[in-house]
């Protein structure tokens, strides 16, 4: 983790700056880098108060600032609410110290430097602004209105909150950014600085300004009189800077000029033992101008060069210089090759002449001459060759001397130019010295004679001036920060007032509606109290009909609404998209469904259990800020109490990865997409049945009501991909509902892996095959558990010969989908995905235990079976059901279920094999017996 250090003791020096890190585990891929780092916190009481290093982590979801003793700790020492906090700092206090005012308390913190303090304050202000001006700020009302909470993925995430959108706050944000303090990039963590540079245009400007300053500082040694190693003056002319993009001809001339100039210059330096401090070699021969003109141009250029030079131009110049250097090296190499080729040609010419002479002496013309003449001719030829060689050497030496003379002339000319410029420089410096001398003499004439006495108070005054300037800069920064803080707090206060007005309007609307209903009931009671004189009840019947009609009304989006918010009444769908009041049922059943929905909402509003559960989950996530989530009794208890709506998507994904991590790691990247592509491109025997069952999967859920619904498209993809993955199952009616429930909180790929987890990891083999062997075995196991846990109820069923497995078979196959209300359904799924299929037995027993007394009161098989078909939907208290399933049903060992599954598996296999043998005998007898064939109907023959 960048910038994280473990302090040696509580009084040690904290790390230099805050840092950003990514939350561990799988959630790290989804969450943005979080703000964390060491700060010194003032703690203790009375005179024992002291600063102690604490590891601070900001949770942006709740805008809570948690602090730990060390960054490895799991439990925080405390927390500071940043959402309702204000910030300040005092210049008179220690460097880096600032205060956070929140919930009536003042927390005093200290950063290692002023830059780090500025960065912390800016980040905390930004997080507070984002939290208070986003829909996440409405999560504080999510207990009353769960639908207003957004989840990251899944079909439920498409739900928009009931509150209207927050007004445009760009004006406040723009005014707020005017007071933003620029932070030095060195203070930022690696990831934070990279993010700010890519996401914030202002940060890009800061980086560009910093690069410009770096260029300016790197060019200081180029200015006259600024070098520390030698008094060297360097002048740059317009022509010199134009050489950055030279033409090829100018480049060649310049290189030749340098080639000619180097040898004599070195020779002169070596002979005279001195070197001139002026570097005029960079200036071309044609670029000579008077010194005063050059100095004037140079002065203007050095003043505006660093500020006007863009970063992009400097990059282009560096690229051009690199290309120029490579071309120079290439030119040097080609010149060397040319010289070697010339030398080779010369040697070849000499060898050619020698061979011609040898050939001449070997020719027939020399056959008639005597040996003395031949010897004399050979000597003459040798002398001629030597003379030719000598002539060539003399010619080369002459050319070389001529070249040296030309170079010496050029160097003499350059030295004269340098001497003239040096003389002009000396003259200019003499003029400056004379002018300064005259000014000094005038100053001495007008000042008292005792100059030493006048210089004594100058040093303290300068120190005081510097101190005042530093204080002025500090107060300016403090004033800027406080202006920004005041502006931001004002905007947040206006937003809070707006939300308060909306809540008041909403409550006024609900109160008015409550008064209307109450007045109608009072009138109805008054009418019912009066004696009835005839069979016609008159007004009372009208009031009853009116009340029933009002109760069955469902909120319509086209009805006029309040100006600010929608009245939060019972809507047509629940938070998960399930239809509350059936559309095709009779009026009496609609009324019962409406009453059930109102009872369920009353439970969620009146009980404090849901609120405490949300707080427990928030505390749990706060304890996992510095560590990965792991299986623990604490997490098990939380899951059994139910996962809050806003955390369910994250936890379901984590549960899936927990159970099939090995399978996912073995799968190739893009495994789901490749399966889906194969299923779509190739012939799939299960695709036809999948298409038939898509619209019948969850017809009472608005995400699956239309063929063009997003849920239908995703469900098709998941089922096709799984049918291609597992050919033994392919597609079985039942897994479509499992996938549909998973898609409500997960995306396509995660829902696919969730389906794999349930079918292949949780359920026994052959659970969804053609024989449904595993499902039949589980029904036998459930019968044994019923005899053990609920003997009275089991005896009651046996007395009236009621086979309750006809009802429970579907519970196990689709994990209670369409069998219980949605709130209980998702509580069951929470525990299922964490603990496995044992949970299904617990809840099935819990449902019967919940309604045991009501079932025992029924005294005939028809009424019992009719009651079993719908009784599970009448159970609304999820907390009571979970308490029965996880407390009253104990002990409930998994080993017992495994042993009973193994025992019944052999029995069911034996029965299935016997049935298969009977079926085979029947088919064989029907085929061989003509009399039996005559009994076959026409329809059977067609089939």
From Swiss-Prot:
Keyword set, alphabetical order: Coiled coil, Endosome, GTPase activation
Superkingdom field: Eukaryota
Gene Ontology MF term list: GTPase activator activity
A Pfam match: RabGAP-TBC
Localisation per UniProt entry: Early endosome
PROSITE patterns (alphabetical): PH_DOMAIN, TBC_RABGAP
Positions of the PH domain: 32-129
Primary location group: other
Segments forming a coiled coil: 315-514
CDD domains: PH_TBC1D2A
Annotated ranges, domain Rab-GAP TBC: 642-836
GO CC terms of this entry: early endosome
Disordered, as annotated region: 1-29
Ranges annotated as biased composition (Polar residues): 10-22
Protein purpose: GTPase-activating protein that plays a role in the early steps of endocytosis.
Protein name per the record: TBC1 domain family member 2B
Native species: Xenopus tropicalis (Western clawed frog)
Gene: tbc1d2b
């Amino acid at each position: 983790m960048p910038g994280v250090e473990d302090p040696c003791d509580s009084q040690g020096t904290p790390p230099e700056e805050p840092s950003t890190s990514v939350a561990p585990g799988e959630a790290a891929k989804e969450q943005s880098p979080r703000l964390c780092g060491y700060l010194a916190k003032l703690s203790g009481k009375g005179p024992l108060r002291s600063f102690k290093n604490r590891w601070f982590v900001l949770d942006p979801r709740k805008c809570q600032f948690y602090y730990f003793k060390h960054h490895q700790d799991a439990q925080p020492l405390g927390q500071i609410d940043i959402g309702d906090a204000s910030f300040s700092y005092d210049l008179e206090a220690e460097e880096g110290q600032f205060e956070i005012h929140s919930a009536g308390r003042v927390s005093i913190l200290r950063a290692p430097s002023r830059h780090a303090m500025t960065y912390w304050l800016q980040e905390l202000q930004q997080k507070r602004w984002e939290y208070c001006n986003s829909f996440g700020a409405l999560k504080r009302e999510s207990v009353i209105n769960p639908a207003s909470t957004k989840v990251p993925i899944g079909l439920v995430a498409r739900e928009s909150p009931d509150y209207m959108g927050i007004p445009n706050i760009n004006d406040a944000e723009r005014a707020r950014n005017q007071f933003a303090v620029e932070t030095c990039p060195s203070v930022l963590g690696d990831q934070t600085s990279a993010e700010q540079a890519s996401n914030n245009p202002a940060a890009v400007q800061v980086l560009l300004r910093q690069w410009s300053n770096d260029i300016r500082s790197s060019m200081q040694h180029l200015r006259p009189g600024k070098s520390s190693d030698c008094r060297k003056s360097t002048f740059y002319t317009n022509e010199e800077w134009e050489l950055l993009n030279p033409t090829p001809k100018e480049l060649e001339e310049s290189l030749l000029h340098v080639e000619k100039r180097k040898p004599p210059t070195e020779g002169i330096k070596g002979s005279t033992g001195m070197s001139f401090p002026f570097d005029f070699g960079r200036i071309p021969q044609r670029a000579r101008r008077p010194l005063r003109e050059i100095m004037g141009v140079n002065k203007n250029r050095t003043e505006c060069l660093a500020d006007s030079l863009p970063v992009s131009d400097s990059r282009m110049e560096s690229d051009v210089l690199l290309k120029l250097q490579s071309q120079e090296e290439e030119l040097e190499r080609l010149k060397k090759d040319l010289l070697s080729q010339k030398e080779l040609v010369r040697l070849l010419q000499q060898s050619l002449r020698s061979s011609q002479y040898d050939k001449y002496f070997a020719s027939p013309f020399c056959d008639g001459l005597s040996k003395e003449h031949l010897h004399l001719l050979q000597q003459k030829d040798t002398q001629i060759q030597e003379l030719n060689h000598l002539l060539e050497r003399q010619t080369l030496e002459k050319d070389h001397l001529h070249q040296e003379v030309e170079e010496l002339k050029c160097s003499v000319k350059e030295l004269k130019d340098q001497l003239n410029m040096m003389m002009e420089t000396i003259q200019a410096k003499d003029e400056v010295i004379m002018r300064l001398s005259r000014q000094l003499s005038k100053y001495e004439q007008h000042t008292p004679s005792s100059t030493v006495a006048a210089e004594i108070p100058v040093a303290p005054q300068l120190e005081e001036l510097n101190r005042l300037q530093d204080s002025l800069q500090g107060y300016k920064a403090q004033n800027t920060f406080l202006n920004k803080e005041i502006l931001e707090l004002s905007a947040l206060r206006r937003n809070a007032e707006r939300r308060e007005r909306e809540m008041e309007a909403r409550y006024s609307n609900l109160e008015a509606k409550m008064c209307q209903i109450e007045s109608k009931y009072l009138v109805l009671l008054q009418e019912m109290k009066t004696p009835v004189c005839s069979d016609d009840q008159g007004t009372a019947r009208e009031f009853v009909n009116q009340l029933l009609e009002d109760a069955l009304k469902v909120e319509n989006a086209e009805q006029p609404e309040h100006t600010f918010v929608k009245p939060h009444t019972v809507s047509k769908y629940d938070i998960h998209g399930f239809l509350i009041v059936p559309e095709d049922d009779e009026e009496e059943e609609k009324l019962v469904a409406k009453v059930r929905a109102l009872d369920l909402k009353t439970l969620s509003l009146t009980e404090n259990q849901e609120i405490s559960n949300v707080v427990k989950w928030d505390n749990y996530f706060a304890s996992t800020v510095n560590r990965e989530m792991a299986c623990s009794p604490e997490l098990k208890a939380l899951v059994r109490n139910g996962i809050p709506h806003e955390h369910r998507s994250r936890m379901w994904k984590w549960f899936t990865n927990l159970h099939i991590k090995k399978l996912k790691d073995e799968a190739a990247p893009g495994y789901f997409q490749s399966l889906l592509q194969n299923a779509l491109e190739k012939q799939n025997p299960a695709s036809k049945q999948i298409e038939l069952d898509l619209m019948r999967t969850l017809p009472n859920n608005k995400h699956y009501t239309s063929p063009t619904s997003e849920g239908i498209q995703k469900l098709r993809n998941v089922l096709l991909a799984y049918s291609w993955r597992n050919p033994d199952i392919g597609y079985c009616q039942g897994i479509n509902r499992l996938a549909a429930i998973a898609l409500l909180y997960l995306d396509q790929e995660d829902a696919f892996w969730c389906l794999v987890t349930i079918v292949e990891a949780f359920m026994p083999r052959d659970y969804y095959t053609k024989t449904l062997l595993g499902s039949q075995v589980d029904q036998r196991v459930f019968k044994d558990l019923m005899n053990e846990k609920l003997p009275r109820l089991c005896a009651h069923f046996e007395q009236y010969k009621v086979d309750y497995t006809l009802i429970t078979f579907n519970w196990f196959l689709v994990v209670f989908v369409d069998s219980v209300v949605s709130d209980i359904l998702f509580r069951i799924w929470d525990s299922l995905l964490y603990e496995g299929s044992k949970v299904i037995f617990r809840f099935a027993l819990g449902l019967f235990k919940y309604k045991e007394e009501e079932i025992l009161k029924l005294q005939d098989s028809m009424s019992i079976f009719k009651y079993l078909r719908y009784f599970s939907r009448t159970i609304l208290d999820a907390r009571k059901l979970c308490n029965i399933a996880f407390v009253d049903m104990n002990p409930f060992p998994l080993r017992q279920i495994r042993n009973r599954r193994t025992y019944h598996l052999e029995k069911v296999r034996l029965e299935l094999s016997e049935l298969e043998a009977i079926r085979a005998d029947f088919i064989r007898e029907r085929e061989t017996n003509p009399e039996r064939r005559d009994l076959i109907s026409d329809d059977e023959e067609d089939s």
